[in-house]
Amino acid sequence: MLARRDLAVCAPLQLELLYSARGPADYSVLREELEGLVELHATPDAEAEALRTQQALAAKGQHRGPKPVDLLIAAIAKVHGAVLLHYDRHFDLIVRVTGQPAEWLARRGTLG
């Protein structure tokens, strides 16, 4: 697995991860763990990239697959030159349009 210094997060990803917390204590622990990671920030370029990607997906009739937050996460990774590490098939649709580097965290269907 990657070292913590090799991982980065962005605010939309943190919101998604923290949404899954089972309660206040779990939320606090997870938030503290995330604070130790490098943070990539949304920029106007990332916002524009997310919109371009959604438009390209719409041209193929696939714009209703990836959630808007997934488009923004992918765009932030792209503009910062980061590899998109994910466990969601919708990112495969995004990557086919953007051509950005991406990797599955684990083989699809193997994590709970």
Report residues per predicted region.
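IMPase-like, lithium-sensitive Mg2+-dependent phosphomonoesterase catalytic core
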Residues: M1-A3, L13, D26-V29, A102, ...
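PIN/NYN-family metal-dependent endoribonuclease catalytic core
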Residues: M1-G23, L37-D45
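Structured helix-beta-strand junction loops
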Residues: A3-R5, E33-L37, K60, H80, ...
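A short secondary-structure junction motif
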Residues: P12-E32, L51-A59
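Alpha-helix capping/helix-boundary segments
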Residues: L13, A46, I73, H90-F91
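A short acidic, often aromatic-flanked loop/helix-cap motif at beta-alpha or helix-coil junctions
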Residues: L15-E16, D45-E49, R108-G112
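Active-site neighborhoods of divalent-metal-dependent phosphate/nucleic-acid chemistry enzymes
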Residues: E39-L85
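Acidic, PIN/NYN-like endoribonuclease modules and their adjacent C-terminal/linker elements
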Residues: A74, K78-G112
